[in-house]
Amino acid sequence: MLPPMALPSVSWMLLSCLILLCQVQGEETQKELPSPRISCPKGSKAYGSPCYALFLSPKSWMDADLACQKRPSGKLVSVLSGAEGSFVSSLVRSISNSYSYIWIGLHDPTQGSEPDGDGWEWSSTDVMNYFAWEKNPSTILNPGHCGSLSRSTGFLKWKDYNCDAKLPYVCKFKD
């Protein structure tokens, strides 16, 4: 058995070891977690890791894409899932409901020369494995070759549109 004078020093040593153990374990846990986005560019909103912003100054599709690229890690928005599409739709509806169409990063650089509308791609080069067409562009007589969201679908569905038209646009900022 320890003498009574040794108990406070043993207790102090034990407490010090426990504090150190907690700190070390906490550091390991923090390293395993992915770091969340700390902040979004001014005027944008986060959804998961990327941030999104609606710009109301109308531009052609090409000028809108360039405007997004001038911002850090920016591209016209690519909509990769129904959940992301719902977020973008709510962002657009919360800021403006006075426009019929909004540019997204979808375009057909082949100008319709691919069979069955297979030339469509995201300007961000994200893989296209989610589709939300209002109407399949390959079935349209005079299709545009740039993608937009249409108000008639609550900004949930994509519509091909004339690339030279001047529309508001949504940028997506990846970290």
Curated annotation (Swiss-Prot):
One of its GO terms (cellular component) is extracellular region. InterPro entries: C-type_lectin-like, C-type_lectin-like/link_sf, C-type_lectin/snaclec_domain, C-type_lectin_CS, CTDL_fold. Proteolytic processing by trypsin removes an inhibitory N-terminal propeptide and is essential for peptidoglycan binding and antibacterial activity. PROSITE patterns: C_TYPE_LECTIN_1 (PS00615), C_TYPE_LECTIN_2 (PS50041). Residues 47-172 form the C-type lectin domain. A motif (EPN) lies at residues 114-116. It comes from the Eukaryota. It is found in: Secreted; Cytoplasm. One of its GO terms (biological process) is negative regulation of keratinocyte differentiation. Keywords: Acute phase, Antimicrobial, Cytoplasm, Disulfide bond, Inflammatory response, Lectin, Metal-binding, Secreted, Signal, Zinc. Residues 27-37 form a propeptide. SUPFAM superfamilies: C-type lectin-like. SMART domains: CLECT. Zn(2+) binds at residues 107, 121, 145. Its main location: secreted. Residues 103-118 are annotated as: Sufficient to activate EXTL3. Residues 1-26 form the signal peptide. Predominantly expressed in pancreas, where it may be restricted to exocrine pancreas. Moderate expression levels in testis and weak in heart, kidney and placenta. Bactericidal C-type lectin which acts exclusively against Gram-positive bacteria and mediates bacterial killing by binding to surface-exposed carbohydrate moieties of peptidoglycan. Restricts bacterial colonization of the intestinal epithelial surface and consequently limits activation of adaptive immune responses by the microbiota. The EPN motif is essential for recognition of the peptidoglycan carbohydrate backbone and for efficient bacterial killing with Glu-114 playing a key role in peptidoglycan binding and bactericidal activity. This is Regenerating islet-derived protein 3-gamma. It comes from Homo sapiens.
